[in-house]
Amino acid sequence: MKLVSNKILFLATMVLASSSAFALKDDVNQPINIVSDNQSLDMEKSVVTFTDNVVITQGSIVIKANKVVITRPAEKSGKKETVEAFGTPVTFHQQLDNGKPVDGKANKVHYDLGNEFLTLTNNAELKQLDSKINGSVITYDVKKQQLKANGNGKSRVTTVLIPSQLQQAKGK
């Protein structure tokens, strides 16, 4: 039973690893809380699934989804953990060290821990104060700190920048 608890704790820790690059420095030291209506664990496949009204919190980070699936491949496979969240939409909120909030949403969020690569798919949006980016797909390479937004054949990427926020960014 203790092995099962340790696996769940480790996998749950992976849920928020993607957001720790943006969040308050102290957030990563806070406890991770996952609340859902249902939870299932497949020990053979090392998959934990949380469903219905999933709320994940750690410090200032809050993630809400309909379903979250955390997969931890066998160590010998050479693959790393992945976290997938599904919702209409999945939402997240974080407080940055500079005090500004970041909000995001998408119908699907995928995080590959091995590559430290975050993908928001379908109706993806990132917003900080009044500035925002909308696209069909938004990707973020955590290591390189590079963001890319793509439209699809029907819609284009939309970016809204507020001049006062641009001036504040230049001054810092």
UniProtKB/Swiss-Prot annotation:
GO annotations of cellular component type:
cell outer membrane; outer membrane-bounded periplasmic space
Single Gene Ontology BP annotation = Gram-negative-bacterium-type cell outer membrane assembly
| Taxonomy, superkingdom | Bacteria
Any one GO MF term held by the record is:
lipopolysaccharide binding
Q: Which InterPro entries does its entry note? A: LPS_export_LptA, LptA, OstA-like_N
* Alphabetic keyword roster: Periplasm, Signal, Transport
The reply on keyword Zinc-finger is no
Signal sequence annotation = 1-23
* Major subcellular site: periplasm
Compartments where found: Periplasm
Q: Does the keyword Signal apply?
A: yes
* Pfam families from the UniProt entry: LptD_N (PF03968)
| Family membership noted in the UniProt record | Belongs to the LptA family.
Function of this protein? Answer: Involved in the assembly of lipopolysaccharide (LPS). Required for the translocation of LPS from the inner membrane to the outer membrane. May form a bridge between the inner membrane and the outer membrane, via interactions with LptC and LptD, thereby facilitating LPS transfer across the periplasm.
Subunit text = Component of the lipopolysaccharide transport and assembly complex.
**Protein name, as recorded:** Lipopolysaccharide export system protein LptA
Q: Which organism is it from?
A: Haemophilus influenzae (strain ATCC 51907 / DSM 11121 / KW20 / Rd)
The protein's gene is named lptA
